[in-house]
Amino acid sequence: MKKWRSRVTTDGLDRAPHRAFMRAMGLDDAALAKPMIGVVSMKGEQTPCNMTHDFQVDAAKSGIAEAGGTPREFTTVSVSDGISMNHEGMKFSLFSRELIADSIEAVVHGLAYDALIGFGGCDKTLPGVIMGMIRCNVPSIFIYGGSALPGRFDGRTLTVLDSYEAVGGFMTGDIDEATLEGIERSCLPTIGACAGQFTANTMAMVSEAMGVTMANVSMIPGVFAERAQVARQAGRLVMQMLQRDGPLPREIVTRKALENGAAIVAATGGSTNAALHLPAIANEAGIVFTIDDVGEVFARTPLIGNLRPGGKYTAKDVFDIGGTAVVIRALIESGHIDGASLTITGRTIAEEYGNANPPDGEVIHSTHTPIMRDGGVAVLKGNLCPDGAVIKVAGLKSVLFEGRARVFEDEEACVDAVRKQDYSAGEVLVIRNEGPVGGPGMREMLGVTALIYGQGMGEKVALITDGRFSGATRGMCIGYVSPEAFVGGPLALVRDGDLIRIDAGARRMNLLVDERELAARRQAWKPRPPRHRAGALAKYARLVGQAPRGAVTHEGPAEWPWFD
C-alpha cells in the first residue's frame, strides 16, 4: 500500500495527539487510514462571485469520499474587485492573489495533505489558486465556480459593466435616475462571477487551455446544477491522480501550456490582467514567461470571440453553443493551441477537445473568418513603456491615438476631474504612482474608465496608467506600464501638455519629447515616500516585483520535501 504523505500526521505512537485532534473533528479509524485531500474555496459573503462554491464544495467532498479519500475543507480570502473598486480597498485586490497562494501553501504543507481541489470565483482567486496548486505540486484540480447569468432591463441584456457605465451616462444627462436604478437592480440577477469575458471568465478559459481543470466546464453558469456533477467528478478524478502519482501541476504547466493560455486570451478578447497572471503562474512552475512572451502569442492569435466588453455576447452564450471547447478546438485546428499539451486526466488537450462543436460564426467565429487577424489584446513597447504595457484592442474603432498629456498623481485625482467632466476630447489622461510598488497594489481603474465611456468619451480620450484595468474596461486604455512611475519609470517624467502617440496596430507607445529635455527631467526627479509604512501593504510593497514578470513576491518555484 502506498504511503501517503499525510501519514506523517496520522501514523505512529507519537501521533496520538494528532489523531486526537482529528477525532475531535469526527474522523474515525477508517477516515484516518485514508489519504487526506484538501478542498479549498472562498465561500462566504464577500462577493456574489464565490457564493456558488457552497454546493459545489459539498459535491467535491462527496466525490472524494466515494473514491476512497478523506476530504478536508478549508477556506481562504477573497477581495471583491467590484466592491473594492475606485477606493483604497482596491489596493488589496492583487495582493490577495499572493495571499491566496501563500495560504494554500501553508495549509497543504502545514497539514500534509496528499492532494488538492481548489475552487475559484472572483478575479484574483483563479490565478491565486492555480499558483498555490503549482507551488505545492501535489495532485490538484482547479474548478471555477461559474459566472452569473446576464440580466435584462428595457429589452437589453446586461452585465455589471452596464451599471458602471450608466453612472457616467447619468452624469451627462444621457439617462435618467430611474434608468440608472433599473440597471443597478437588474444587471446581476444571480450569484456567480461577472458574466462577460472579464477577468474571471478569461482566467477560467485559461485554466482549460492550460489543462489544469476538467474539459469544457468553465462556461457552465454558476447556478446550474450541472456544476455539482462536475465537482463530484473532480473529487473522483483527484483520487485517481493520487493513485497514479499525477500528472502533477508542474508536469502540466509547461511553456506550451502557458502559450495555450495566452492564445485563448487573445482569441476571446479577454482580460488584460491575464498578461499579469500568466507570468506569475509561470514563475511558480520555474518558467520565465514574461509579458514579452505573452505579447508574442497575442500578436499571432486571431480574435474569434464576439464577447463583452469588446463584443456582444456573454459566458452564457458561449455555454449555449458548446462551451470553451468550441474555442479550444478551433485554435488547435488552426495551430494556435498546442494539442499535444497534457491535462489533469493524463490525456492531451487534443484528445479532450477533439469532439467539440465547430464555431457558430456569431458568438465564436472561425479562425478563417476572424473578427480581427491580430488578437484582441496587445502588448505595447516604446520610450514611455520600455518594459511593456497592455491594451485591449477588441472593439476599438481606431487603434491610433495622439494627444496632449493631462497628468494625475493618483486615481482619485483623475476620477474627480472626470466626475466634473473637467477634461477634453483629444487628451491623454495619465494616472501614475498606481503600480505594484507605488500604489501599492496596482489598483484597477474600471471606475474611471467606465465613467469616461458612459459619458460618451470612451474613444475620444486615451488613458494611460501604471495601474491595472478590470477585464470589463474598454476604450483607448493602456495599463501595466512598466517600469512604474514610483520606481523612476518614464511615466514619472511626463508633464501636462506633452505629446503622446499610441499606435496599438504597431504595438508602440511613445512620449514625443526631446531626449535632452527628458534627461533634464530625470536629473530633477525625486522618488516619492512610500504610502504605507506598516501593515500588509507595506510588506507587499517591499517584496513585489514589476508587471512584466507578473508582479510576484518571490522568484522561482518553491521546493518542499515529500515525506518519507
What are these regions (language model features)?
Residues 93-102:
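Glycine-rich, highly charged phosphate/nucleotide-binding loops
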Residues 107-129, 141-144:
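A short, small-residue-rich loop immediately preceding and capping a beta-strand
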